Swiss-Prot record:
Gene Ontology cellular component terms for the protein in this record: endoplasmic reticulum; endoplasmic reticulum membrane
Record topology, Cytoplasmic segments: 49-54, 158-163
Cellular compartments annotated: Endoplasmic reticulum membrane
Name of the protein: Translocon-associated protein subunit gamma
Quaternary context: Heterotetramer of TRAP-alpha, TRAP-beta, TRAP-delta and TRAP-gamma.
Regions of this protein lying in the Lumenal compartment: 1-27, 77-135
Family, per entry: Belongs to the TRAP-gamma family.
Organism (species): Homo sapiens (Human)
Amino acid sequence: MAPKGSSKQQSEEDLLLQDFSRNLSAKSSALFFGNAFIVSAIPIWLYWRIWHMDLIQSAVLYSVMTLVSTYLVAFAYKNVKFVLKHKVAQKREDAVSKEVTRKLSEADNRKMSRKEKDERILWKKNEVADYEATTFSIFYNNTLFLVVVIVASFFILKNFNPTVNYILSISASSGLIALLSTGSK
């Protein structure tokens, strides 16, 4: 049986490893897939109103392409968030450290060990980096996806049949952002 201090240290290590892993929490997954579904469904309006593709006749096509696009966009969110989180954490470290130190009262400051202060700073830094990386990842990928859909639909594929135009523009847009998200820089 492991000593009590050992299990506490193990849980702290697990929390730290969780902060730096590629695995998403259920909350992050729901946020990513919800946003990805919304942004993937937006082009349906474009094709329904501008390209005159009937909603009922094209419902199966819209559903399949929206689901495929949702998966690829959520994949891109996850990859971009992972790359950005470490960069944001490094840039925000000093500011977060000052903020946490300032928030601790003098009494708390004297009672707390240096290790505990460092743990609080690390936890806050990871929380800030996670939030900023998540919001920027969603913004960046949504913008890129919608711009590529519009450019592909109205300029590159404008002479194609609307059904082929839809399939190619949604596939190209979601595939491109998924591909670009796999880069490490």
